[in-house]
Amino acid sequence: MMQASLWSLVTTSVRPTCVKRIVPGLTAAQQRRYASTIEADLVVIGGGPGGYVASIKGAQLGMKTVCIEKGETLGGTCLNVGCIPSKSLLNSSHYYHLAHAGELKKFGILVDNVKLDLERVMEQKRNTVKALTGGIASLYKKNKVEWVKGHGKITSPNQVNALGPDGSVISTINTKNIIIATGSEVTPFPGLEFDEKQIISSTGCLSLSQVPKKFIVIGAGVIGLELGSVWQRLGAEVTAIEFLPTIGGVGIDGEVSQMIQKMLVKDSWNFKLGTKVTTARKQGNDIIVSVENVKDPSKKEELTCDALLVCVGRRPYTTNLGLEDLGIERDEKGRIPVNNRFQTVVPSIYAIGDCIHGPMLAHKAEDEGVITVEGIAGGAVHIDYNCVPSVIYLHPEVGWVGKSEEDLKKEGIEYKIGKFPYLANSRAKTNAETEGFVKILADKNTDKILGVHMICSCAGELINEAVLAMEYGASAEDVARTCHAHPTFAEAFKEANLAAYFGKPINF
Protein backbone atom coordinates (compact mmCIF):
# COMPACT_ATOMS: atom_id res chain seq x y z
CA MET A 1 0.00 0.00 0.00
CA MET A 2 2.81 2.37 0.92
CA GLN A 3 4.66 1.53 -2.31
CA ALA A 4 1.56 2.26 -4.37
CA SER A 5 1.05 5.65 -2.74
CA LEU A 6 4.71 6.45 -3.27
CA TRP A 7 4.57 5.79 -7.01
CA SER A 8 1.31 7.69 -7.16
CA LEU A 9 3.17 10.70 -5.78
CA VAL A 10 5.89 10.32 -8.41
CA THR A 11 3.58 9.97 -11.38
CA THR A 12 1.30 12.86 -10.40
CA SER A 13 4.19 15.30 -9.90
CA VAL A 14 5.22 17.02 -13.11
CA ARG A 15 8.72 17.91 -11.86
CA PRO A 16 9.22 16.68 -8.29
CA THR A 17 12.10 18.20 -6.36
CA CYS A 18 12.31 15.16 -4.12
CA VAL A 19 10.37 12.09 -3.13
CA LYS A 20 10.12 11.15 0.52
CA ARG A 21 9.03 7.85 2.06
CA ILE A 22 6.92 8.74 5.11
CA VAL A 23 7.55 6.46 8.09
CA PRO A 24 5.40 7.10 11.20
CA GLY A 25 7.33 7.99 14.34
CA LEU A 26 10.39 9.44 12.61
CA THR A 27 11.34 13.11 12.55
CA ALA A 28 11.61 15.01 9.28
CA ALA A 29 15.40 14.82 9.48
CA GLN A 30 15.23 11.03 9.84
CA GLN A 31 12.99 10.43 6.84
CA ARG A 32 14.83 8.93 3.87
CA ARG A 33 14.99 11.17 0.81
CA TYR A 34 15.13 10.01 -2.78
CA ALA A 35 16.94 12.53 -4.97
CA SER A 36 15.26 13.51 -8.22
CA THR A 37 16.91 14.53 -11.47
CA ILE A 38 15.79 17.67 -13.27
CA GLU A 39 16.74 18.79 -16.77
CA ALA A 40 17.12 22.56 -17.25
CA ASP A 41 18.56 25.22 -19.51
CA LEU A 42 19.60 27.50 -16.66
CA VAL A 43 20.30 26.98 -12.98
CA VAL A 44 20.62 30.03 -10.74
CA ILE A 45 22.19 29.45 -7.32
CA GLY A 46 20.71 32.05 -4.98
CA GLY A 47 17.32 33.77 -4.84
CA GLY A 48 18.42 37.27 -3.83
CA PRO A 49 18.05 40.41 -5.99
CA GLY A 50 20.55 39.21 -8.60
CA GLY A 51 19.44 35.60 -8.57
CA TYR A 52 15.67 36.01 -8.65
CA VAL A 53 15.85 38.64 -11.40
CA ALA A 54 18.17 36.41 -13.46
CA SER A 55 15.80 33.47 -12.95
CA ILE A 56 12.76 35.41 -14.13
CA LYS A 57 14.63 36.88 -17.10
CA GLY A 58 15.82 33.42 -18.12
CA ALA A 59 12.27 32.07 -18.03
CA GLN A 60 10.99 35.07 -19.99
CA LEU A 61 13.56 34.32 -22.70
CA GLY A 62 12.28 30.77 -23.02
CA MET A 63 14.80 28.94 -20.85
CA LYS A 64 13.71 26.15 -18.55
CA THR A 65 14.96 27.77 -15.34
CA VAL A 66 15.62 26.36 -11.88
CA CYS A 67 16.57 28.52 -8.89
CA ILE A 68 18.25 26.88 -5.91
CA GLU A 69 17.73 28.88 -2.71
CA LYS A 70 18.22 27.50 0.79
CA GLY A 71 16.25 30.18 2.64
CA GLU A 72 12.67 29.75 3.77
CA THR A 73 11.75 32.71 1.58
CA LEU A 74 13.11 34.25 -1.60
CA GLY A 75 14.71 37.69 -1.78
CA GLY A 76 18.05 37.02 -0.10
CA THR A 77 19.64 39.41 2.38
CA CYS A 78 18.06 42.48 0.77
CA LEU A 79 14.41 41.55 1.24
CA ASN A 80 14.72 39.48 4.40
CA VAL A 81 17.37 41.10 6.60
CA GLY A 82 18.73 44.06 4.66
CA CYS A 83 17.40 46.81 2.41
CA ILE A 84 13.68 46.27 2.94
CA PRO A 85 13.34 45.75 6.71
CA SER A 86 15.85 48.52 7.40
CA LYS A 87 13.87 50.98 5.26
CA SER A 88 10.69 50.04 7.07
CA LEU A 89 12.34 50.79 10.42
CA LEU A 90 13.85 54.01 9.07
CA ASN A 91 10.42 55.16 7.90
CA SER A 92 8.67 54.32 11.17
CA SER A 93 11.42 55.88 13.29
CA HIS A 94 11.28 59.05 11.18
CA TYR A 95 7.55 59.43 11.83
CA TYR A 96 8.09 58.85 15.54
CA HIS A 97 10.86 61.43 15.63
CA LEU A 98 8.70 64.06 13.90
CA ALA A 99 5.95 63.61 16.47
CA HIS A 100 8.09 63.07 19.58
CA ALA A 101 10.57 65.89 18.88
CA GLY A 102 7.82 68.41 18.16
CA GLU A 103 8.78 68.79 14.51
CA LEU A 104 5.11 68.81 13.52
CA LYS A 105 4.30 71.96 15.50
CA LYS A 106 5.60 74.25 12.76
CA PHE A 107 2.93 72.78 10.48
CA GLY A 108 0.21 73.51 13.02
CA ILE A 109 -0.07 69.89 14.14
CA LEU A 110 -0.03 69.49 17.92
CA VAL A 111 0.62 65.99 19.23
CA ASP A 112 0.84 65.28 22.96
CA ASN A 113 1.88 62.20 24.95
CA VAL A 114 3.64 60.53 22.03
CA LYS A 115 4.40 56.89 22.79
CA LEU A 116 6.40 54.24 20.99
CA ASP A 117 4.88 50.82 20.33
CA LEU A 118 8.03 48.98 19.26
CA GLU A 119 6.22 45.70 18.67
CA ARG A 120 3.90 47.39 16.19
CA VAL A 121 6.92 48.93 14.46
CA MET A 122 8.35 45.43 14.11
CA GLU A 123 5.01 44.06 12.93
CA GLN A 124 4.92 46.64 10.14
CA LYS A 125 8.44 45.56 9.15
CA ARG A 126 7.50 41.86 9.15
CA ASN A 127 4.36 42.45 7.10
CA THR A 128 6.33 44.40 4.51
CA VAL A 129 8.95 41.66 4.22
CA LYS A 130 6.28 38.95 4.01
CA ALA A 131 4.42 40.76 1.23
CA LEU A 132 7.52 41.33 -0.89
CA THR A 133 9.08 37.89 -0.47
CA GLY A 134 5.72 36.34 -1.22
CA GLY A 135 5.54 38.54 -4.28
CA ILE A 136 8.72 36.99 -5.65
CA ALA A 137 7.33 33.50 -5.10
CA SER A 138 4.25 34.55 -7.08
CA LEU A 139 6.45 35.91 -9.87
CA TYR A 140 8.24 32.56 -9.99
CA LYS A 141 4.93 30.77 -10.48
CA LYS A 142 3.78 33.30 -13.06
CA ASN A 143 6.99 32.93 -15.08
CA LYS A 144 7.30 29.15 -14.49
CA VAL A 145 10.59 29.32 -12.59
CA GLU A 146 11.12 26.20 -10.48
CA TRP A 147 12.41 26.84 -6.96
CA VAL A 148 14.37 24.00 -5.39
CA LYS A 149 14.91 24.68 -1.70
CA GLY A 150 18.45 23.71 -0.74
CA HIS A 151 22.13 24.61 -0.87
CA GLY A 152 23.49 24.62 -4.41
CA LYS A 153 26.76 22.78 -5.02
CA ILE A 154 28.25 22.57 -8.50
CA THR A 155 29.48 19.09 -9.37
CA SER A 156 30.44 19.64 -13.02
CA PRO A 157 30.27 22.43 -15.64
CA ASN A 158 26.70 21.33 -16.40
CA GLN A 159 25.39 19.87 -13.17
CA VAL A 160 24.34 21.19 -9.76
CA ASN A 161 23.23 19.30 -6.67
CA ALA A 162 20.72 20.83 -4.27
CA LEU A 163 21.71 19.76 -0.77
CA GLY A 164 19.55 19.54 2.34
CA PRO A 165 20.56 20.85 5.79
CA ASP A 166 22.21 17.50 6.55
CA GLY A 167 24.24 17.56 3.32
CA SER A 168 22.17 14.92 1.54
CA VAL A 169 21.31 15.40 -2.13
CA ILE A 170 17.72 16.56 -2.63
CA SER A 171 17.90 17.09 -6.37
CA THR A 172 20.41 16.81 -9.17
CA ILE A 173 19.91 19.35 -11.94
CA ASN A 174 21.51 18.89 -15.34
CA THR A 175 21.78 22.22 -17.11
CA LYS A 176 23.34 24.08 -20.01
CA ASN A 177 24.38 27.11 -17.94
CA ILE A 178 24.85 28.02 -14.28
CA ILE A 179 24.73 31.45 -12.63
CA ILE A 180 26.23 31.86 -9.16
CA ALA A 181 24.30 34.57 -7.29
CA THR A 182 25.02 33.60 -3.70
CA GLY A 183 25.41 37.13 -2.34
CA SER A 184 27.34 38.06 0.78
CA GLU A 185 27.35 37.65 4.54
CA VAL A 186 28.27 39.80 7.55
CA THR A 187 32.02 40.14 8.05
CA PRO A 188 32.87 38.96 11.58
CA PHE A 189 34.92 41.14 13.92
CA PRO A 190 37.96 39.40 15.43
CA GLY A 191 37.38 38.54 19.09
CA LEU A 192 33.65 39.32 19.08
CA GLU A 193 30.85 36.77 18.96
CA PHE A 194 27.35 37.86 18.02
CA ASP A 195 24.62 36.98 20.50
CA GLU A 196 22.19 39.20 18.53
CA LYS A 197 20.90 40.67 21.79
CA GLN A 198 23.72 42.90 23.00
CA ILE A 199 26.55 42.27 20.55
CA ILE A 200 24.65 42.42 17.30
CA SER A 201 25.11 42.27 13.55
CA SER A 202 22.99 44.20 11.08
CA THR A 203 20.58 41.25 11.17
CA GLY A 204 20.07 41.36 14.94
CA CYS A 205 19.80 45.14 14.85
CA LEU A 206 16.57 44.82 12.87
CA SER A 207 14.82 42.89 15.64
CA LEU A 208 15.81 44.40 19.00
CA SER A 209 13.10 43.98 21.64
CA GLN A 210 13.79 47.32 23.31
CA VAL A 211 15.50 50.63 22.56
CA PRO A 212 19.09 50.68 23.87
CA LYS A 213 20.06 53.51 26.19
CA LYS A 214 23.63 53.72 24.94
CA PHE A 215 24.25 52.35 21.47
CA ILE A 216 27.73 52.00 19.94
CA VAL A 217 28.20 51.35 16.23
CA ILE A 218 31.51 49.99 14.96
CA GLY A 219 31.71 51.30 11.41
CA ALA A 220 30.28 54.58 10.09
CA GLY A 221 29.60 53.38 6.57
CA VAL A 222 26.20 53.18 4.90
CA ILE A 223 24.78 50.36 7.05
CA GLY A 224 26.12 51.72 10.33
CA LEU A 225 24.71 55.20 9.69
CA GLU A 226 21.28 53.93 8.65
CA LEU A 227 20.80 51.47 11.50
CA GLY A 228 22.28 53.89 14.01
CA SER A 229 19.73 56.46 12.83
CA VAL A 230 16.83 54.10 13.51
CA TRP A 231 17.70 53.69 17.18
CA GLN A 232 18.87 57.28 17.67
CA ARG A 233 15.46 58.54 16.53
CA LEU A 234 13.77 56.10 18.90
CA GLY A 235 15.74 57.41 21.87
CA ALA A 236 19.19 55.80 21.99
CA GLU A 237 22.38 57.76 22.62
CA VAL A 238 24.50 56.77 19.61
CA THR A 239 28.29 56.77 19.25
CA ALA A 240 29.87 55.70 15.95
CA ILE A 241 33.46 54.44 15.90
CA GLU A 242 35.15 54.61 12.49
CA PHE A 243 38.67 53.55 11.50
CA LEU A 244 38.73 56.04 8.61
CA PRO A 245 38.88 59.82 9.12
CA THR A 246 35.53 60.31 7.33
CA ILE A 247 32.04 58.79 7.39
CA GLY A 248 29.81 57.42 4.63
CA GLY A 249 32.00 54.66 3.24
CA VAL A 250 33.72 54.20 -0.11
CA GLY A 251 32.88 56.54 -3.00
CA ILE A 252 31.21 59.34 -1.08
CA ASP A 253 32.33 62.87 -1.94
CA GLY A 254 34.36 64.52 0.83
CA GLU A 255 32.20 67.65 0.98
CA VAL A 256 29.05 65.54 1.24
CA SER A 257 30.58 63.40 3.99
CA GLN A 258 31.45 66.47 6.05
CA MET A 259 27.96 67.93 5.71
CA ILE A 260 26.10 64.78 6.75
CA GLN A 261 28.41 64.43 9.74
CA LYS A 262 27.47 67.96 10.84
CA MET A 263 23.79 67.11 10.42
CA LEU A 264 24.11 63.94 12.49
CA VAL A 265 26.05 65.73 15.22
CA LYS A 266 23.18 68.23 15.36
CA ASP A 267 20.92 65.20 15.91
CA SER A 268 23.07 64.29 18.95
CA TRP A 269 25.31 61.67 17.32
CA ASN A 270 28.81 61.20 18.71
CA PHE A 271 31.68 60.27 16.40
CA LYS A 272 35.07 58.72 17.09
CA LEU A 273 36.84 58.95 13.73
CA GLY A 274 40.31 57.65 12.98
CA THR A 275 39.70 55.25 15.84
CA LYS A 276 40.32 51.52 16.15
CA VAL A 277 38.40 49.08 18.36
CA THR A 278 40.85 46.81 20.15
CA THR A 279 38.56 44.76 22.40
CA ALA A 280 35.00 44.57 23.67
CA ARG A 281 33.83 42.64 26.71
CA LYS A 282 30.65 42.17 28.69
CA GLN A 283 30.58 43.50 32.24
CA GLY A 284 27.27 42.86 33.96
CA ASN A 285 24.56 44.33 31.77
CA ASP A 286 27.02 46.59 29.97
CA ILE A 287 29.58 46.19 27.21
CA ILE A 288 32.97 47.84 27.62
CA VAL A 289 34.54 48.83 24.30
CA SER A 290 38.26 49.65 24.28
CA VAL A 291 39.50 51.93 21.50
CA GLU A 292 42.70 53.64 20.42
CA ASN A 293 43.64 56.39 18.01
CA VAL A 294 44.78 55.05 14.62
CA LYS A 295 47.63 57.56 14.25
CA ASP A 296 48.63 57.56 17.91
CA PRO A 297 47.89 54.17 19.58
CA SER A 298 48.97 55.59 22.95
CA LYS A 299 45.70 57.53 23.01
CA LYS A 300 43.32 54.95 24.45
CA GLU A 301 39.78 55.14 25.79
CA GLU A 302 37.03 52.91 27.15
CA LEU A 303 33.40 53.40 26.14
CA THR A 304 30.33 51.83 27.73
CA CYS A 305 27.10 50.76 26.06
CA ASP A 306 24.24 48.31 26.49
CA ALA A 307 24.15 47.37 22.78
CA LEU A 308 27.04 47.10 20.33
CA LEU A 309 26.40 47.00 16.58
CA VAL A 310 29.23 45.64 14.43
CA CYS A 311 29.10 47.01 10.86
CA VAL A 312 32.56 46.45 9.41
CA GLY A 313 31.39 45.35 5.99
CA ARG A 314 30.26 42.21 4.22
CA ARG A 315 32.14 39.39 2.50
CA PRO A 316 31.17 37.25 -0.50
CA TYR A 317 29.38 34.01 0.30
CA THR A 318 31.35 31.69 -1.95
CA THR A 319 32.26 28.69 0.22
CA ASN A 320 31.09 25.09 -0.27
CA LEU A 321 29.95 25.71 -3.84
CA GLY A 322 32.30 23.15 -5.39
CA LEU A 323 34.39 25.85 -7.08
CA GLU A 324 37.80 24.43 -6.21
CA ASP A 325 37.06 21.06 -7.83
CA LEU A 326 36.23 22.88 -11.07
CA GLY A 327 39.36 25.03 -11.06
CA ILE A 328 37.50 28.24 -10.22
CA GLU A 329 39.70 30.20 -7.84
CA ARG A 330 38.62 33.08 -5.61
CA ASP A 331 40.57 36.27 -4.97
CA GLU A 332 41.92 37.43 -1.61
CA LYS A 333 38.49 38.80 -0.65
CA GLY A 334 36.66 35.62 -1.57
CA ARG A 335 35.24 37.05 -4.80
CA ILE A 336 34.86 35.02 -7.98
CA PRO A 337 36.80 36.47 -10.96
CA VAL A 338 34.71 36.88 -14.12
CA ASN A 339 35.20 38.33 -17.61
CA ASN A 340 33.14 41.10 -19.21
CA ARG A 341 30.35 38.60 -19.94
CA PHE A 342 30.36 37.48 -16.27
CA GLN A 343 31.81 34.09 -17.18
CA THR A 344 34.20 32.34 -14.83
CA VAL A 345 37.13 30.29 -16.16
CA VAL A 346 34.51 27.62 -16.86
CA PRO A 347 32.53 29.07 -19.82
CA SER A 348 29.17 27.59 -18.79
CA ILE A 349 29.41 28.97 -15.24
CA TYR A 350 28.71 32.65 -14.56
CA ALA A 351 28.75 34.78 -11.40
CA ILE A 352 27.01 38.05 -10.49
CA GLY A 353 26.26 40.37 -7.58
CA ASP A 354 28.02 40.54 -4.23
CA CYS A 355 30.17 37.48 -4.96
CA ILE A 356 32.11 39.29 -7.72
CA HIS A 357 33.90 42.63 -8.00
CA GLY A 358 32.16 45.97 -7.55
CA PRO A 359 29.89 47.57 -4.97
CA MET A 360 27.64 45.27 -2.96
CA LEU A 361 24.35 46.80 -4.06
CA ALA A 362 21.06 45.07 -4.84
CA HIS A 363 20.40 47.14 -7.96
CA LYS A 364 23.88 46.42 -9.31
CA ALA A 365 23.22 42.69 -8.87
CA GLU A 366 19.84 43.00 -10.60
CA ASP A 367 21.36 44.68 -13.65
CA GLU A 368 24.10 42.05 -13.82
CA GLY A 369 21.48 39.31 -13.61
CA VAL A 370 19.51 40.67 -16.55
CA ILE A 371 22.44 41.30 -18.87
CA THR A 372 24.13 38.00 -18.02
CA VAL A 373 21.04 36.06 -19.06
CA GLU A 374 20.66 38.20 -22.17
CA GLY A 375 24.28 37.40 -22.98
CA ILE A 376 23.64 33.68 -22.57
CA ALA A 377 20.75 34.09 -25.03
CA GLY A 378 23.11 35.71 -27.54
CA GLY A 379 22.55 39.37 -26.73
CA ALA A 380 25.01 42.16 -25.99
CA VAL A 381 26.50 42.45 -22.50
CA HIS A 382 27.34 45.90 -21.17
CA ILE A 383 27.18 47.70 -17.85
CA ASP A 384 28.71 51.07 -16.97
CA TYR A 385 29.69 50.85 -13.31
CA ASN A 386 30.21 54.60 -13.29
CA CYS A 387 26.42 54.85 -13.64
CA VAL A 388 25.53 52.69 -10.63
CA PRO A 389 24.07 54.99 -7.93
CA SER A 390 24.51 54.82 -4.17
CA VAL A 391 22.08 56.05 -1.50
CA ILE A 392 22.29 56.48 2.26
CA TYR A 393 18.74 56.55 3.63
CA LEU A 394 19.17 59.11 6.38
CA HIS A 395 16.97 62.16 6.67
CA PRO A 396 17.79 64.05 4.58
CA GLU A 397 18.90 61.29 2.24
CA VAL A 398 22.27 61.17 0.50
CA GLY A 399 22.67 60.08 -3.12
CA TRP A 400 25.52 60.00 -5.57
CA VAL A 401 26.58 58.53 -8.89
CA GLY A 402 29.82 58.72 -10.83
CA LYS A 403 33.04 60.39 -9.78
CA SER A 404 33.70 62.33 -6.59
CA GLU A 405 36.03 65.32 -6.47
CA GLU A 406 38.64 63.09 -4.85
CA ASP A 407 38.36 60.61 -7.76
CA LEU A 408 38.81 63.30 -10.39
CA LYS A 409 41.80 64.85 -8.66
CA LYS A 410 43.43 61.43 -8.33
CA GLU A 411 42.83 60.68 -12.02
CA GLY A 412 44.07 64.11 -13.11
CA ILE A 413 40.82 65.05 -14.86
CA GLU A 414 40.04 68.76 -15.16
CA TYR A 415 36.52 69.47 -13.98
CA LYS A 416 34.10 72.24 -13.09
CA ILE A 417 31.55 72.39 -10.29
CA GLY A 418 27.93 73.49 -10.28
CA LYS A 419 26.07 73.69 -6.95
CA PHE A 420 22.62 74.67 -5.81
CA PRO A 421 21.41 74.73 -2.18
CA TYR A 422 17.96 73.50 -1.16
CA LEU A 423 17.67 76.62 0.95
CA ALA A 424 16.77 78.34 -2.34
CA ASN A 425 14.43 75.63 -3.66
CA SER A 426 10.70 76.44 -3.57
CA ARG A 427 9.44 72.93 -2.79
CA ALA A 428 12.04 72.45 -0.08
CA LYS A 429 10.82 75.71 1.48
CA THR A 430 7.17 74.63 1.43
CA ASN A 431 8.10 71.33 3.09
CA ALA A 432 10.51 72.93 5.59
CA GLU A 433 13.24 70.57 4.33
CA THR A 434 15.92 72.99 3.23
CA GLU A 435 19.04 71.13 4.36
CA GLY A 436 21.35 69.94 1.61
CA PHE A 437 22.40 70.73 -1.94
CA VAL A 438 22.99 69.30 -5.41
CA LYS A 439 26.55 69.21 -6.71
CA ILE A 440 27.46 68.59 -10.35
CA LEU A 441 30.95 67.63 -11.49
CA ALA A 442 31.38 68.11 -15.25
CA ASP A 443 34.34 67.82 -17.60
CA LYS A 444 35.96 71.24 -17.91
CA ASN A 445 36.46 70.90 -21.66
CA THR A 446 33.52 68.83 -22.92
CA ASP A 447 30.86 69.70 -20.29
CA LYS A 448 30.01 65.98 -19.94
CA ILE A 449 28.57 65.15 -16.51
CA LEU A 450 31.10 63.04 -14.59
CA GLY A 451 29.50 62.87 -11.17
CA VAL A 452 26.43 64.01 -9.24
CA HIS A 453 26.16 64.29 -5.46
CA MET A 454 23.13 65.40 -3.50
CA ILE A 455 21.67 65.72 -0.04
CA CYS A 456 17.92 66.21 0.23
CA SER A 457 14.83 64.52 1.61
CA CYS A 458 14.25 62.67 -1.68
CA ALA A 459 17.81 62.09 -2.90
CA GLY A 460 17.12 58.37 -3.29
CA GLU A 461 14.51 59.20 -5.93
CA LEU A 462 16.17 62.22 -7.53
CA ILE A 463 19.56 60.55 -8.05
CA ASN A 464 17.92 58.37 -10.71
CA GLU A 465 17.48 61.41 -12.97
CA ALA A 466 21.23 61.92 -12.73
CA VAL A 467 21.83 58.25 -13.57
CA LEU A 468 19.66 58.51 -16.68
CA ALA A 469 21.48 61.65 -17.80
CA MET A 470 24.91 60.07 -17.31
CA GLU A 471 23.91 56.75 -18.91
CA TYR A 472 23.18 58.62 -22.13
CA GLY A 473 26.29 60.83 -21.93
CA ALA A 474 24.48 64.07 -21.13
CA SER A 475 26.27 67.36 -20.68
CA ALA A 476 25.46 69.89 -17.97
CA GLU A 477 23.92 72.05 -20.70
CA ASP A 478 21.60 69.20 -21.75
CA VAL A 479 20.07 69.07 -18.27
CA ALA A 480 20.14 72.85 -17.84
CA ARG A 481 18.00 73.23 -20.97
CA THR A 482 15.52 70.51 -19.96
CA CYS A 483 12.24 71.87 -18.59
CA HIS A 484 11.52 70.76 -15.01
CA ALA A 485 8.12 71.01 -13.29
CA HIS A 486 7.67 73.73 -10.65
CA PRO A 487 7.74 73.56 -7.69
CA THR A 488 9.80 70.37 -7.31
CA PHE A 489 12.96 69.22 -5.57
CA ALA A 490 14.23 68.22 -9.04
CA GLU A 491 14.54 71.88 -10.02
CA ALA A 492 17.67 72.02 -7.85
CA PHE A 493 19.24 69.44 -10.17
CA LYS A 494 18.52 71.67 -13.15
CA GLU A 495 19.85 74.75 -11.33
CA ALA A 496 23.08 72.97 -10.36
CA ASN A 497 23.62 72.06 -14.01
CA LEU A 498 22.95 75.68 -14.96
CA ALA A 499 25.67 76.65 -12.51
CA ALA A 500 28.07 74.10 -14.00
CA TYR A 501 27.51 75.16 -17.61
CA PHE A 502 26.72 78.89 -17.42
CA GLY A 503 28.70 79.67 -14.30
CA LYS A 504 25.70 80.60 -12.15
CA PRO A 505 22.14 79.39 -11.45
CA ILE A 506 18.99 81.50 -11.82
CA ASN A 507 17.51 81.29 -8.33
CA PHE A 508 20.55 81.69 -6.10
Language-model segments: residues:
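Residues that mark the start of a beta-strand
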Residues: D41, G62-K64, K213-K214, S348, ...
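Glycine-rich flavin
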Residues: L6, R15-V19, V23, I38-A40, ...
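Beta1/beta-strand and adjacent pyrophosphate-binding region of the FAD-binding site
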Residues: S36-G50, V211-G221
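FAD-site-proximal beta/loop scaffold in flavoenzymes
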Residues: D195-V211, E302-I376, E461, A469
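Short hydrophobic core segments
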Residues: V43-I45, G152, T172-G183, V217-I218, ...
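N-terminal mitochondrial targeting presequences
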Residues: P24-I38
